[in-house]
Amino acid sequence: MLNFACDYLDAAHPKVFEALMKNNFVKTGCYDESESDCFCNAAREKIRAACGVPDAEVRFLSGGTQTNKVVISTMLKPWQGVIAARTGHIAVHEAGAIEASGHKVIEIAEHQGKISAEAVDKVFRAWHGDGNRLHMVEPGMVYITQPTEYGTVYSLAELTALSEVCRRWGVPLYVDG
């Protein structure tokens, strides 16, 4: 049976342990992101190079819930919420972390964990068409998990369609995976 509950509650691949053992006695910094941590510094440089921003500030977080809360609360304005599948990770498994930051999770219907571009577009059209929208949570981001909580995977066509809807409405598409 395949279980997609959590990627850090299962055994690690033997090659992961080999890599850890190979570097087990390398001394690195702790409690800060000092220059003494060669592994984090190497990762920062790879991220900067991949993004094409050589002077970018790169920070590392310890877990997915913390990361989702920081990213979502930073990208949304105070009056905005995030659209997510009713079964999405931020709607079900993160103990209200997003709502604790003051942002509503706008849950929408899904099929096997996936939300459709049409359903997302409908949320934006409904909000923009409502004469009372100034008193409502504005959808400011779309959140998906890849793979979903059911283990289903968005196809390239589905991702492209979601991305196009997000671009049309001027909001980010956040992929948690």
Indicate residue ranges for each PLM-predicted region.
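Catalytic PLP-binding core of fold-type I/II PLP enzymes
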Residues: 154-177
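Conserved core of the PLP fold type I
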Residues: 55-76, 106-113
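N-terminal amphipathic/basic leader segments beginning at the initiator methionine
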Residues: 1-19
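Conserved PLP-anchoring active-site segment centered on the Schiff-base-forming lysine
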Residues: 74-92, 121
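Conserved N-terminal alpha-helix of the aminotransferase class I/II PLP-enzyme fold
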Residues: 13-64, 86-91, 97
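Hydrophobic beta-strand scaffold residues
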Residues: 82, 105-106, 173-175
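Buried hydrophobic positions in well-ordered alpha/beta secondary-structure cores of metabolic enzymes
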Residues: 4, 47, 67, 98, ...
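PLP-dependent aminotransferase-class I/II
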Residues: 102-149, 153-161
